[in-house]
Amino acid sequence: MLELPLKTDFTGKVVVVTGAGGVLCGDMARAFAQAGAKVAALDLNEDKVKKLAEELKNEGFVCEGYAANVLEAEQVKAVHARILEDLGKCDILINGAGGNNKRATTDNEYQHEAKAGQTTFFDLDTEGVDFVFRLNFQG
């Protein structure tokens, strides 16, 4: 059974957390920092990930925040180089980036007959669905 905070000592380990601007992955980043890890927090939302990194640093932990779109290989490569320089080689990767997109969501998932103006499966934006697929499967 997992006990929080983490009881394992991660001192000296570099933990990279994608999606760290969100609630779940932000808490994972915080837990690893509290357990002694040097944390690289990545997120598409630069403001959120920089705020998390600042909070953890103010609490005495080692954390760097990086803005990156995990669907863009060049951004990931650039952030990887910065992490190597700032914190060292990644020991643990929490590949937590994911989510949904309004363009890939229907108005009512259990509706049998669509009402005028409601988005059904057949009305979904293919680019929105593709974005969600790539983010959650490839990202």
Give the predicted meaning of each segment:
Residues 46-47, 67-81, 126:
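The beta1-alpha1 cofactor-binding region of Rossmann-like NAD(H)/NADP(H)-dependent oxidoreductases
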Residues 35-52:
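Conserved glycine-rich Rossmann-like NAD(P)H-binding loop of the short-chain dehydrogenase/reductase
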Residues 104-130:
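Substrate-binding pocket helix/loop in short-chain dehydrogenase/reductase
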Residues 3-40:
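Canonical Rossmann dinucleotide-binding motif of NAD(H)/NADP(H)-dependent dehydrogenases/reductases
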Residues 23, 96, 100-104:
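Active-site beta-alpha loop architecture of Rossmann-like, nucleotide-cofactor-dependent enzymes
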